[in-house]
Amino acid sequence: GHIWKFITLAYVPPTIAGIVLAYRGKLLWGGILTALFVALQITSNHVQMSYYFFFVILFFVGAYFEKAWRTKTLPQFFKASAVLIVAALVGIAANVSNLYHTYAYSKETMRGKSELVQTGDAAKQTSSGLDRDYITQWSYGIDETLTLLVPNFKGGASAALSQSETAMSKANPMYSSLYGSLTQYFGTQPMTSGPVYVGAFVLFLFVLGCFIVKGPLKWALIGATFFSIVLSWGKNFMPLTDFFIDYVPMYNKFRAVSSILVIAEFTIPLLACLLYTSPSPRD
């Protein structure tokens, strides 16, 4: 549920911190933090959020690999990677029973493989996992991405238009009976309880950080940010969505692709915060 989603997300920053510590040479503390918070993430039992942040980890690993290649420190990189792999396995092993039963149960649900043979357009759906239409039902609109900067760019939440004092102050009283059946939101999603908004000032600091912050963390955060935004478009950008549904393991097990914007809500403020650290080309 949504409560466990927030609890899982709360364990993401210290997990990332453990990974960064390991690649900075602090193998013991990096390994301990990673093992502990990977275990707590999985215990929180919102696999979708942990799955999404696995992509963020890949961006971090890729950025540190590029740095190690460039600075000829590959042995240290592989040593840190080995420690992190062991730490992740420890965290997973602590939850192996729960993970196994979730996996076994999912095969008997709508996320498992259908026993029916489909033809025509229906055959284009996934052979196992959720249907494409269901996966992408909650897809963020391409222009709706501007809500990161302007929260009500698409009207805000799916509340009745009649509840907006601003709108009603300019509305024609002749059509007052219609306003209760119209929603303030006019984006591509079926409905929403509110936009994804990170703040104009935070977004300004993020853009500034793209030019000022040095080191591999910056490139990992920038890459993960744009990755999450493009994937959140779902049915509005099907070439990439189709690729992930067809070829990326487990991606077709999760619905509401717009929720991957939790990555951007993590990476944008983090890069903004890095502006307040002492400038150093090392990290």
What are these regions (language model features)?
Residues 1-7, 183-196, 226-267:
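Membrane-helix boundary/interfacial segments in multi-pass membrane proteins
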Residues 15-31, 62-71:
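Membrane-interface transmembrane helices that cradle and orient dolichyl/undecaprenyl
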Residues 18, 31-46, 87-93, 227:
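Membrane-interface alpha helices of multi-pass inner-membrane proteins
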Residues 24-39, 74-85:
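Short hydrophobic alpha-helices at membrane interfaces in multi-pass membrane enzymes
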Residues 69-82, 166-180, 205-235:
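Membrane-interface helix-loop-helix junctions at transmembrane boundaries of multi-pass membrane enzymes
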Residues 76-103, 119-124, 225-227:
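Hydrophobic alpha-helical membrane-interfacial segments at the cytosolic entry of transmembrane helices
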Residues 97-209:
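Periplasmic/ER-lumenal interhelical loops and adjacent helix-loop junctions
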Residues 276-283:
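Conserved small/polar residues in nucleotide/adenosyl-binding loops
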